[in-house]
């Protein structure tokens, strides 16, 4: 192995949709056998790290410790803590994203939050968009969990978190700070979690 540690994309490296990618599975097993540190990095905010861990074990034959899974949700929280703008937030997103941000000590504020965080929300509606728009107009820091405009589903390419952010950007004329891949924030945070220098880390991705 060339590097002292690896960042591994899930979709396209370990699986494609529900289909296993044997080469990705074999690569992770090699890292584990050689005790080379690695971190799975994913833009998905609808799954908690525990859910990702269970999915990898149950569907893709990869047993991995919880601390080897780094999601855009975790990177978003790390970024919010670093920014230190306050402990209030309005979140558009799945229950997992909202719960994780609350667990990190951020209190929901629908009027004047320090942050507006927008991730994938299967039940988004006009009122949620309105609350976010008004808060950003008042000065809330606008964060997008990831810029993915579409997500592949069995029905076809559906709107992703990036599409929801684009609507709010159009309404506020404020660009969100995107956390997830391919942006630098999630990768910088992941590198910090591995505790290695950038040049010592390889990346396994599509």
Question: Which role fits each region the language model picked out?
Answer:
Residues 1-10, 14-205:
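HAD-like aspartate-dependent phosphatase fold
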């Amino acid at each position: 192995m060339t590097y002292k540690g690896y960042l591994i994309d899930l979709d396209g490296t370990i699986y494609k949709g529900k289909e296993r990618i044997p080469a990705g599975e074999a690569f992770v097993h090699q890292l584990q056998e050689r005790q080379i540190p690695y971190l799975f990095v994913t833009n998905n905010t609808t799954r908690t790290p525990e859910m990702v861990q269970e999915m990898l074990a149950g569907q893709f034959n990869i047993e991995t410790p919880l601390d080897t899974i780094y999601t855009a949700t975790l990177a978003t929280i790390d970024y919010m803590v670093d920014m230190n703008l306050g402990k209030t937030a309005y979140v558009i997103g799945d229950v997992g994203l909202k719960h994780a941000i609350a667990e990190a000590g951020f209190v929901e504020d629908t009027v004047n939050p320090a942050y507006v965080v927008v991730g994938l929300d299967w039940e988004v509606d006009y009122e949620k968009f309105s609350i976010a728009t008004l808060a950003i107009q008042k000065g809330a820091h606008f964060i997008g969990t990831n810029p993915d405009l579409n997500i592949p589903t069995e029905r076809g390419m559906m709107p992703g978190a990036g599409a929801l952010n684009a609507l709010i950007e159009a309404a506020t004329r404020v660009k969100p700070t995107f956390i997830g891949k391919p942006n630098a924030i999630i990768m910088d945070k992941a590198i910090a979690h591995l505790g290695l220098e950038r040049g010592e880390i390889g990346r396994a991705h599509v």
